[in-house]
Amino acid sequence: FRFDLASIMGRNEDGSPMSKPPILQSLAFDPILGRVKLIAEAWDAGGLYQVGSFPAWNRWSEWNGRFRDDLRCFLKGDYGMAQAAIERILGSADLYSPENRGENATVNFLNCHDGFTLYDMYAYNWKHNEKNGWNNTDGDNNNNSWNCGEEGESMNPEVLALRNRMRKNSFAVLMCSRGAAMFLAGDEFCNTQFGNNNAYCQDNEISWIDWSRKEQYSEMFEFCKFMIQLRKEHPILRGRSGPSGCGFPEVSVHNSKAWNAECNQDTHTIGVMFAGRNASNTEDDIIYIGVNTFWEYCDIELPKLPLGRKWKVLVNTEFEHTQDVDYDLLTRRKSDILLTMCPRSVLVARVEKYFE
């Protein structure tokens, strides 16, 4: 069950927040609901914001609004967002203590039924709710969206290519982040609400899912399927899986230089490496996610590997996705560990064994 504006259930008779709200505690320990997932939208209409502090009793998970906001800002190139983005990708330990709640408490998302769809997030800078009947005064004004140079629908091939890459960047990062991943139905094939970010009152083509777009945006659909399968095949992306045999730490943070975790206001390129064991515990499972939100090409250095192992690029959003694409051959390499990333792109690589 997901509870809309759940923080209202934690207010006292006078409206003040309670530390142990009886209704939330009852739901947490109810024997009939013992095997049911309880998910809170951890804020309410009165301004109470409890992301990271919702009364949980280790039973409630939360929609992580910080994940949405921080990653949207970082991915579109805002300054000073690199460290926050890293925290979100690693499971938001600053919000959900690993000792008490951990990654299972965070439901990561970038889009939901409230706000822009993923397609609209990179097509509109401003909401367009005129058809709702309130002179465009309803809906949130703080969308952290970016239209990639033109407002609304575009015929410019450069704008369209950039929007396509930005959508893939967002979905790839979501699927490579610790915690539960959630995306809005229709985002996998670029459903649009035509810039309306408050479409609850529209029972028409504004809020309906247009299934014809599945064919029109089949390349995005296949990319999303690929990323979902990648997440399933690599449990290290979802949580701890035991120490790796090669001695790498379970998680490590990098900027454009391997093992250099320094971030500042101007940092736009980050790398995150997860190292552990595969699902059958037969070999190491090591995944690296590189994110370049800068508007220029950037060289990124992957960690040097032990003898007999190499990096293989699985995803590179610079290139279109097809079923038989080999990103490893397409990706610009200067050496075994030095790669060139195009502006505003994401790559995912894994460690493979090789024998000469």
Regions found by a protein language model. Name each.
Residues 1-12:
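Active-site groove signature of glycoside hydrolases
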Residues 160-168, 173-183, 187-356:
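Carbohydrate-interacting/catalytic domains
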Residues 12, 20-185, 189, 198-202, ...:
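Conserved alpha/beta catalytic core and glycan-binding cleft of carbohydrate-active enzymes
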Residues 14-15, 51, 300-303:
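Short amphipathic alpha-helical segments
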